[in-house]
Amino acid sequence: MPVAPFAAEFDQVFKARERECLEYYHSCAPPLSLEDALIYRSAASGLLWCKKFYRWVVIRWLSGDPNHPAPPVERLKTDNAYWRRLYADDVISMPDSWEYPYFCQWDLMFHSVAFAPIDPATAKAQSMLLRSPRYTAPNAQTPAYEWALSDPNPPIGAWAALRVFQIERHDRGSGDLPYLRAAMRKLILEYGWWANRNDRSGDNVFEGGFLGLDNIGVFDRRYPLSDGSVIEQCDGTAWMAMLSLNLLEIAVILSAEEPEYKDLAERFVYDFAQLASTLNTDAVINETAKVMRSYRNWDEQDGFYYDVIKRQDGSWDYLRSRSISGLIPLLAVASFDVDTVQRVESLDVNSILRPYLAERICPNWISQHFGRWNNDRTLFSLVPESHLRRILEYVFDEDEFLSPNGVRSLSKVYEENPYTFCEGEETGTLAYSPADSPVAMFGGNSNWRGPVWMPFNFLLIESLQKFGRYYGDTFKIEFPTRSGNWISLWDASLELEKRLVGLFRRGEDGRRPFNGAVELFQNDPHWKDLLLFNEYFHGDNGSGVGASHQTGWTAIVLKMLTQLQRYNSM
């Protein structure tokens, strides 16, 4: 072997490639400090590194290879057997190319949005991939992940398509309307699957299923309890409401050039109204004028949205655990300016839809969700203003959800006082656990019982900004709660972004919170500037937990850096 395996010009070539890399990221990112530019570049490069080739032909997996032993017959009895036409043969952005080397449906949507500023073409391709004919089931369901293709995941595909379009339009001067039209066609099919499959009782309650939050419930929310009771998940209905508004926003954009999309926009207004009624009123009336429910997910006593346990005899109870499951309703919000409302008549709820809605839904709350104007905008919100203030008092309370590095997934009040609920012969307990999972549910390698998760925080930040755009300075909240520091919802969103970006920034002590007590990573000159993007973060001190290379959805922090710079709030 030669003494010098590389040619003399190797260093020059390597430095040239390094310079080109820096120039490319400089062209994508706003002007940032050296510290923040490192975070941005590390997040983006990790996102690129987690793209892997993935091949899985389900029919071959079921039937086996010629001239080889047949696979276990049990495969034919699994839910995955329904997906026999799934044919994966693509480069896919993995959640973590080491620990999670496979596609995950809702993770991939966050990856797409994170890709949008640095590679719009990849962002669009990844956001559409799982909705292509090679992946979707005959009933239009989108696959979840390889071990349980049929699991329902949070339906954020419309949000991802909308944000990818908007980011490219902002950064490049024009949005890709053909992409948005193609996305809409596929999303409409998936929307039909959600509406027809999960609303089993006909009362707009979406219950059962994974829904992305793993072990967040006091019971495993995927299954009925042993006595036949079922859990009506407030976040399931809220995710569906968010999907309705995302599709409404897409339809409104497309209707500017193709007026036929106005009919779709009207449909989503109706659907959103029904979903808002489900979470917020004491009774839901279906199309046959039959009262389906005598309760709501909003608990006026506590000022929070809770899951409801519904028994076979018709009785019910709240599962009074304060988790981000009860914060998901905050994500279903949109507002439109005067010109847009004049162009798309169905957005003018007061003059067009109020008679229809008043007959089919409870008229006394319509004005709380529709038709209100402020800052020359009209608001569509699953959470009315009176509920919003009460929920945010919990969100921004440092004894509840607000941590030094973002919003926790479970209230800290359950650290010393765990929540326990007994139902028949089953007893469930939920305790605040800020780091690793305390239970084996879902394998025990993720934990939604206290840690800070970047994807939910990002969605919450965007929702606060939507509320802030509508309310302006007419709605202020204490940040933190009981601090006497009253700020607008827009400013509150930026304060959250600072806390989340702070996970990766060096503090005054020279330490990065995500590295925790690992002195090698904190201080060694060879390691201290090599950033990892963990799956989730300790709910008290911000140290990284879970998969350590999950640059996928944690890379969304680069969008936060962009916003903080754009609004001069570094």
What are these regions (language model features)?
Residues 1-570:
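Acidic, mature catalytic/reactive cores of soluble proteins
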